[in-house]
Amino acid sequence: MKKRFLAFLLAVCVAVSMLVLPASAVGSNAAVQTATALGGLTAEQAGSLGAPLTRGQAARLLTAFSAYRDTTTAQGRTGRLYSDVDSDSPYAVYIRTAVQNGWMTGYSDGSFRPDNTVTLEEACTMALRLLGYDVAKLGGTFPTAQLSKASALGLRNEINARQGETLTLEQGTMLFYNALTAMNGSGQVYASTLGFAVSNGQVDISSVLLDLSLIHISEPTRPR
């Protein structure tokens, strides 16, 4: 509860700081703002956005931009997930969520390789799965089909990376943020299925903050 409240306060501070920025800066930082509010980025990560996006970080962002963002703290530890992911890994709960929902997969040797970097086409595939698309049924072959579909949905907006290039943490955050305003596999704006409002092509941060505040208020206080 304390961690969630601190995340809420951080999100409020970030949102307030946006009020004094020019419109162009607000737009470019909307993804980071929303990801921070939802717990997809730590304060440290938000200050190191030029670092390469890793698979562990991608799992955390995917979970933050999903309906499972509020359930991770209640899952607890369930033993070793992969040969290189212990239960006490900071990414363990997010990796488990991402794999169980089919957004990501491990490797045939029993590893997950959480520190491996993520390319544009890999991130696009993850985002498409998050949106409920069956990537195996897309017309064409990998990665052309995935990149084409991602472009059609607007997932690659404001991302200048090309096929085969490793994404930065900022680019990965932007790509998954773009998924919020895209149409999911059922033809709905994805953000609306999470209870968020969309205005002028961006997620209304006030609806995100309201969601977080309601969660905080509804949580019972633990006895000391």
Where are these regions (language model features)?
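N-terminal propeptides
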Residues: 1-214, 218, 222
